[in-house]
């Protein structure tokens, strides 16, 4: 079973962002190719029975919701691709969505860590938690590498030099 891999999301996002304007791929199609991990988590939830079944089903629903949110982020990226590449309009909104996505990933990682002590699920959740944490770090790296509009100077616009 393949655990949630945030690097797939970043690969899709980067492919959309770096494509020439005339060849921007459809992020929904890319998401269908890459974002299968929510379904894998749902399958995991169906496989287990016992006391944790309801918790696992709740996690699977969260994963599906998370996958839908990521697809929405990709759709927003498609709509604003030229502005995002140039660092102008759309950047703040996209950055905000990515930050919320990273925050959700982090919270899910904490939840997975809390279930590690359960002997039956410990190894599975340890692996999922590690994937979530790695994904959160990758999202933060991506946010750090996004283009920024010009940084305003402290003393206002540049003044012409005096001779």
Where are the regions that the model predicts?
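Non-heme di-metal
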Residues: 1-163
């Amino acid at each position: 079973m393949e655990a949630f891999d945030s690097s797939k999301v970043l690969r899709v996002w980067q492919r959309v962002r770096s494509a020439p304007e005339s060849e921007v791929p459809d992020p929904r199609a890319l998401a269908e190719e890459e974002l299968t991990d929510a379904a894998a988590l749902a399958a995991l939830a169906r496989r287990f029975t016992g006391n944790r079944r309801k918790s696992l089903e709740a996690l699977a629903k969260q994963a599906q919701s998370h996958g839908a949110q990521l697809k929405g982020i990709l759709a927003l990226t498609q709509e604003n691709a030229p502005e995002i590449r140039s660092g102008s309009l759309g950047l703040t909104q996209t950055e905000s969505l990515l930050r919320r996505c990273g925050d959700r990933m982090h919270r899910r990682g904490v939840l997975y860590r809390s279930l590690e002590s359960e002997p039956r699920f410990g190894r599975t959740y340890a692996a999922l938690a590690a994937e979530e944490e790695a994904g959160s770090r990758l999202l933060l790296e991506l946010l750090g590498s996004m283009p920024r509009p010009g940084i305003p100077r402290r003393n206002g616009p540049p003044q012409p030099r005096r001779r």
